[in-house]
Amino acid sequence: MSDDLYREAILDHYKHPRQKGHLLAPDIQFHDHNPFCGDEITVELKVENGIVVDAAFDGHGCAISQATASMLMEEIIGKPLEELKTLDKEYILDLLGIEIGPVRLKCALLPLKVLKAGVWGLEEWPE
């Protein structure tokens, strides 16, 4: 896929986010923010037998953070929690499909950070 198609997909996820909202009685919930640009993300998961059966996010911020959250929530439904623990920066960059500069990298990685903190059961992200 060309960079233009990836950019279109990112813009579409930003303008029409998937899985945005809240779940009724989520099994996992975590919230965090990026103080440098004001992005905020809350991730909620429903889990059965160690598998994500539903996922949602809520928050606000730049196009990259919100689109990444939307794309990530779609991708993780049906995956085992143990697999989510192994997701990394490269996974997010592959998901986005375009080069992300250093300034926007924290924006792109915030949804993953929030997801992994929730899956690992952290009360707060270690500084």
What are these regions (language model features)?
Residues 37, 59-67:
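Short, thiol/selenol-centered motifs that function as redox-active sites or metal-ligating centers
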Residues 64-69, 107-110:
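Catalytic-loop motifs flanking and including active-site residues across diverse enzymes
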